[in-house]
Amino acid sequence: MKHFARGVTHDSRFFEPTPIYCVKAKGSRKWDVDSNEYIDFWMGHGALILGHANPAVTKAVVEQARKGTHYGASHELEIEWAEKVKHLVPCARNGLVEFTSSGTEATMMALRIARVYMGKTKVVKFISHFHGWLDYTIVDYNPAFSPPLTGSFPSGVPEETCRTMVALPPNDVESVEKTLEQGDIAAVILEPGGASMGYLPTSKSFLQELRRITRKTGVVLIFDEVVTGFRDTPGGAQEHYGVTPDISTLGKILGGGYPGGAVAGKKELMEMLDIKKEEGWDARRISHPGTFNANPISAAAGNVCLGLIKEGKVHPKVNRVGKEFKSALNDVLQDNNINGLAWETTPSIVFIGFGFSEEDLQVVDIDSYVKFQKKKDQSQKVVKRLEKAMINKGVHLMSGRFILSVAHDKTDIQATAEKFGLSLKELEAEGTLKEFT
C-alpha cells in the first residue's frame, strides 16, 4: 500500500491477504518472489496464447530492440502486421486497420468512428459485457430495467455521458429491436463470445439477429474482439460464428504478449481517420495521435504471433487441450458429487461455477439475467475460496477462469485436475460447499 492505492496496478490482481508478485515466467509456468512455482492460467490476462517467453517472439523482440524501440516514423513491420490482421480478420479483409496502444484505446476509437460516421451519439451495449475502462463503456446500468435490475451509474462519470449509453440485457433481441427502431443509435457494441470473456455466453442465433437488425436500421455493429480475436479461431469470434461486424476492436493476442490494440473494419468507416484536402473535412475527421501506436517492439512480437496463427500452428493444439481440460474438471465435479459446472464459449478459456446448470447460462432478457447474476454471486463466494486453495497448491486461476495457451500440455491438465479435486475436498471439509453437495 506504500506505492499503490490498493497494492496492485490492476483491479483483478488484487488478492487477499497479499497479491502474488512474480519474478519470472516460462511456458505454462511462473514463479513468485518466494520461489513458489505455479501452473499459470492467467496467461497475461489472455494475451499469451503462445505461453510465457515464447522463443520465437522473444528472439524477434530482442533483435528489434537492438535496431531501435521507437523510430518516431513509420516502418515496414507495421505494414506486415496490418497485412496479417487483414488476412485473418473477416471484417478487415476489404477494409483498413488502425493501430492503438491497447484494447481500451481501440474501443474508444471504434465508438468515435461510429458516432462521426452516423452523426449520432447514443450507443447500445449489453450489461456485464466488458469493453475496457473508458467512461462510456463502463456504464453497466439502465434505470429502465430497475427493478429488477439494481445498481447505479459509475462513480466519476458525468450522468450526461452515461445517458449516451443504452445498456440492454444480454442476448435480448426484443430490447435491441425496440431500441434501434427509435432511430437515434449510432452503434451496437458487444463481446461476441459473451460477457466477461464469455462467462455469460452469447449464442450464434443472437449474433445473427443482431446483424440482421443493425443492417436493417443502418446502425454500425462493433465486435469487441480484444479477447476473442485470434483466440476462438484464427479469425476470431466473427469467423467462428460466421457473423461479420462492420468494425472490430482487437488487443491482447494481437501484440504477441506486448502492448497493442487495433480497430479494423469497413473502408467507408475507417476513412473517418483519413486526411483529405476537402473543404470542411478537417472539422469532421477524427484525429488519432498516440506515441506508441504500432511501436516496433509490439509490431515485431505481433508479427511472429499472428504468423504462427496464420500457419495453423496454434489453434489445433490449444483448442484440443482446452476441451480436454473442461472435461477433466467436469469429471472431478461429478466424481465428488458437487453441483458445479465447467463451461466455455471458446475452447481455450474454461470457466468454473457452482450451482449452475447449462440452462442457467441461457440468458435472453432482464429476468433471466437477474436470476443468473444471483447464482453467479453465490458461486463467486466459493470461487474466491477455491482460488486460494489452488494457489496454495501451485495453480493460479483468474477468478474462476482458466485461460490456456499452446504451452499447456497433458501434464498441466492432469496436475491441475488433481489439485482441483484436492481443493474441493478441502472446501467441503470446512463447509464452504455445503450448499452445493
Regions found by a protein language model. Give the residues of each.
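Conserved N-terminal phosphate-binding loop of PLP-dependent enzymes in the Aspartate aminotransferase
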Residues: 1-437
